[in-house]
Amino acid sequence: MVSDRRLLKKFGKIADKIIALEPQMRQLKDEDFILKTQEFKQMLENGKSLDDILIEVYAVAREAARRVLGLNAYKMQLIGGIILNSGDIAEMRTGEGKTLTGIFPAYLNALSGKGVHIVTVNEYLSRRDSEINGKVFDLLGISVGLNGSSLTKTEKREAYNKDITYTTNAELGFDYLRDNMVSDYSLKVQRKLNYCIIDEADSVLIDEARTPLIISGGTSTRINLYKAANNFALTLKEHDDLDIDLESKQVYLNEQGMKKANEFFSLKNLFAIENTEIFHLIMNALKAQFAFKEGVEYTVRDNEILLIDQFTGRIMHGRSYSDGLQQALQAKENVDIEEETVTLATITYQNFYRLYSKIAGMTGTAKTEEEEFIKIYNTRVIQTPTNKPVIRKDEPDLTFGTKNAALKKLVEDVLEAHKKGAPILIGTTSVESSEQIARYLKKANLKFETINAKNHDREAEIVAKAGEIGAITLATNMAGRGTDIKLAKGVAELGGLRVFGVERNEARRIDNQLRGRSGRQGDPGLSRFYISMDDDLMMRFTAPKTRQRFKALGDDYIKSKMFTRAVTNAQKKLEGMNFDQRKNVLDYDNILAQQREIIYAQRDDILEANDLSVVIEKMQITAAYELIEKHSTLVHGEKTINKKELLEVIDGILVPKNKFRIDDFNNKEKMDLAVEIAEAMMQLYKARISDIPDDVIIVMERKIILDAFDKHWTKHLDIAGKLKSGIYLQQYAQNNPLAIYIEQATNLFNKMKINIANEVVENLANVILRVVEDEEQREERIEVTDKDIEEILFETGLQPSDINNKAINQRFDELEEEFKDDKQKLRRLRIQRDVMLGLVLELERRAEMIISPQNDQQAITQLIKELQNDIDIASITIDQIHQNFNNMVEQINDPEKLKHLVIAKDVLLQLVARMDDIKEQEKQTRKKKKKKPHEDESSKTKIG
């Protein structure tokens, strides 16, 4: 691999050539920049590569930035831009102008028209950078979009269709997952993933890599089980019942713990397959009780569990743990237990960013993680020299026996620096630590600003003022990244910004980020860490005897470069463990990634296809083969097809009636027979859809196939997740857990594809039949007139007095039996039956329309029956209704019932009037013509 020095020398020569074009670029008029952009695009169309035009493109962008922002990029920023275009990580110190550096590769790659994504860690930075740099891109004739969580799908699509899109890493990943859940291709918002520039690349690609992106949906709650698992966890004791690995923060039941679990839940064997759910709940309860701390991984606010970003200290609103861990934490903290979520779609950041054709990133600290960048993302980390030498003083750590002693010394040093007026930034690793330090500062009557998970709304504003005289800022971890701390006038003379770190972080890189807040662009500064044996890192990596010796120091401390190196070595060990953990996440996700790519690619094909017959045909072959397997029995060690059973389940249902005989199944290989059955399936399917418009069919097919894909993919993710959570137990059987997982996940995936095929074939058969029936019913509802009713009565021999459900069904049953061999006549009879039954329904609806919703409908219906006095609706006269009404009125004293009776009379009179109209039409028809009316095409259209 080429060394950084050689690369920087090579890129430095290119940067010199860019700077040499400055006099020429100064001659450009403002309107010339758009013309240059058009010229560059034409050069690419004519076969030039991005590298071929890089020098002139960067020179034009440099001049545009100078005119718009008043910033003339210096050589190191141009070198950073060249590194980014090469698809690598540029390590640039704080204050070295990363925002300006990103303009050059973004402009160059936007010329291809394939889109550029500039990724930030929060929406504030996305908005800020898009507004500032957007003015430069506007002069260049390049469109800029801003993506955010509050945008509609249309707004997101517009943002992604711009030449350059600013977005947060989380929103970018969630948009990708949501795009692969849409039911119509036009609903997608993203284009193909081409090129992205990631700001704070270490935060996105390393720190957040352990947490996958998950889109969840609701499922049933199991509140009592969560509480039971939590109560069980409370009965356990460390060492006696549990093995807790402090280094990896993993919690396991030991042999005694397993015995207790069996007793508590009345189980014979906790690890039996039927107890998978219980085991999963127990493991989550153990994590919640013993591995997660309030104020570190999460906080409780307003009866709700809120997740804390471990690397910035910010609350992650809208985010929750999946697979029941959120509910386990809710049970632990005794807050309302929410509905458990099931994973609908998921991807790790590692596998998401590997979908891009090219990725690049900028950060102040990444060299310590270069091995991971190379192995996971195939990107190098190239350190760019600072524009001015770093003169900040990094002092050795002060190591104490107790946290109390460390914080006392911290307050002394803060008071001393504050008396001089020097600004101070105190960095902590958690909200809990931040609040503890705040109490010490308040006790010393010091005024300070705080940024942590519970107070981050004014983050950028507080960080920007942290360089003012007398400012004291208490920040959780790397809150405020992306916002420079500029020294106020006179601060440099006071020694610059003091950075005091309380407790070392898990990674040297994060410590370096904290140090790097001081001493930007050649400013003076000082950094120092206060370490105690109570710190998490020390508890995990120092021997009890060592901790005891330090505690004997009291308030005294050790200031030793040797011990500082020992702490650094512990961090290196932890970095290796964290890398292994992230690599482990990736190894398990790789199998899902391959499966996800297959599913998403097939999904896209289905969304874009205008003809799905090939897809359906393949599924029919799969379904046919599975049917053959299902109806095969083991005879003398060989599976033999039960031919009679097989014929019964397919004949007339999945294949045309009498298409196969039992003899047709003789002497055939199962796959050959499956192909024959599938061909017959397609034959019947095409016959059933022959009368349905193509545009209706494609929509129906697409929906059925996508529904099956999504349903079974979701189920697969859930099963695979549960499989992974317990796979570590395989190591006790001397098996390789990853190898077992890959094998079982592959089998699950193959089974999932079979289930999809079976469901699609079955649902297509059922739904298409319903569509045919619905289409018939839709047609028969078109323009059904009194003349149509008249013709049906004449054809079928029905009388007006027969207009009730029982008489209609009885007569049509007789006619269908009579014409059972005449398919056309049968079709017409079915339509006529539905028309007549529809007429009865219409008469009933008319009655209901008159009855006000506020009235007692049941009472009125009973009164209508009494008014009819057991006389058929077709025979009763208006006079009889009035007579019955008068008789009933004399017997009613209740005003409410009298009102109901009046309504009932009106309803009945309307029904009788309708029947009289039908009778009159029948008489007129019989007078005109006694033979069957001519059945012309227009009547067929109206009725059928």
Curated annotation (Swiss-Prot):
Binding-site list for ATP: 77, 95-99, 484
- Locations listed in the record: Cell membrane; Cytoplasm
- Chain positions covered by the region annotation Disordered: 920-944
Q: Which GO cellular component terms, listed alphabetically, does the Swiss-Prot or TrEMBL entry include?
A: cell envelope Sec protein transport complex; cytosol; plasma membrane
Membrane topology summary? Peripheral membrane protein
Q: Where mainly found?
A: membrane
* A biological process term (GO) from this entry: protein transport by the Sec complex
Matching CDD domains, A to Z?
DEXDc_SecA, SF2_C_secA
Q: Which UniProt keywords apply?
A: ATP-binding, Cell membrane, Cytoplasm, Membrane, Nucleotide-binding, Protein transport, Translocase, Translocation, Transport
- Sequence ranges of Basic and acidic residues compositional bias: 933-944
This entry's Gene Ontology molecular function terms read: ATP binding; protein-exporting ATPase activity
EC number assigned by the record: 7.4.2.8
Q: What top-level class of enzyme does the UniProt entry assign?
A: translocase
UniProt keyword annotation of Transport present: yes
What catalytic activity is recorded? ATP + H2O + cellular proteinSide 1 = ADP + phosphate + cellular proteinSide 2
Which chain positions lie within coiled-coil regions? none
Q: Which family does it belong to?
A: Belongs to the SecA family.
Q: How does it assemble?
A: Monomer and homodimer. Part of the essential Sec protein translocation apparatus which comprises SecA, SecYEG and auxiliary proteins SecDF. Other proteins may also be involved.
PANTHER family recorded for this chain? Answer: CHLOROPLAST PROTEIN-TRANSPORTING ATPASE (PTHR30612:SF0), SECA INNER MEMBRANE COMPONENT OF SEC PROTEIN SECRETION SYSTEM (PTHR30612)
Q: What does this protein do?
A: Part of the Sec protein translocase complex. Interacts with the SecYEG preprotein conducting channel. Has a central role in coupling the hydrolysis of ATP to the transfer of proteins into and across the cell membrane, serving as an ATP-driven molecular motor driving the stepwise translocation of polypeptide chains across the membrane.
Protein name, please? Protein translocase subunit SecA
